[in-house]
UniProtKB/Swiss-Prot annotation:
GO cellular component: cytoplasm
Metal-binding in keyword set: yes
Molecular function GO labels: methylthioribulose 1-phosphate dehydratase activity; zinc ion binding
Gene3D superfamilies, alphabetized: Class II aldolase/adducin N-terminal domain
EC number(s) per entry: 4.2.1.109
Names of the cofactor(s): Zn(2+)
Species of the source: Leptospira interrogans serogroup Icterohaemorrhagiae serovar Lai (strain 56601)
Gene field: mtnB
Catalytic reaction(s) noted: 5-(methylsulfanyl)-D-ribulose 1-phosphate = 5-methylsulfanyl-2,3-dioxopentyl phosphate + H2O
This protein's name: Methylthioribulose-1-phosphate dehydratase
Record keywords: Amino-acid biosynthesis, Lyase, Metal-binding, Methionine biosynthesis, Zinc
Amino acid sequence: MSVKKQLERLSELGAYYHKNGWMPGTAGNLSIRIPEESGFWVSGSGLDKNLLNKRNFLYVDLESGKPVDSKNIKATKGLKPSAETSIHRAVYRALDGVGCGLHVHTLESNLICANTSKNEPIVLFELPAIEILKAYGIWEENPKVYVPIIYNFPNVQDISDCLEKYLKEYRPHVPFCIIEKHGITVWGKDAVQANRNLEATDFILKYMTSWKSFSYSGEPRKLSVSDVLGQDRREIFSVEFPVYPATFY
């Protein structure tokens, strides 16, 4: 599929997500990466997602993180990349085979609280072992599946740095992460798969925030990432990654 067609498809998804309440105001951003290219396309800053078109996307160099000219499509004059562009860049730099990133601000993702902090910027959150996990290719019976929740640093680059370091060192169980009190970033090999993963993720978070018994009090149990993922003990941020059963606002 041509770049033009892919950006038109992302524009359609932006309108759909805006209608669903996943991209309220001008929140969120969408991106694609063409295999073997040195950059990626991402929606510009401050745009209403129900009004996107192919010229509302900038081409960003993967290494520098800066917008560069593209021979394919000329972006709208004066368009600037969102600060959250660095989140998309982190995923593309850390994981092979990713061709689409979707960053949205769903209500349910903002309700989940893991008590992250600057000193404990990532915790692992256990997902319920329900049927929809098969959308991610997880077919085991009663699997133990965890998603990283990242502290919502004021500087988005700090969020991106945490995410990239985590993804590079540990194979993620699922194709998404949660940024606490902020939103979710979901990815896939292309827009079709990424959208499917986003729909599954939204269902899971709705399920969790609707299930009252998922609300716990008291101290969470803590495990290191290596304990959870069954790898050699390694600490990424020189602190343990706690696993929270779940708490909601």
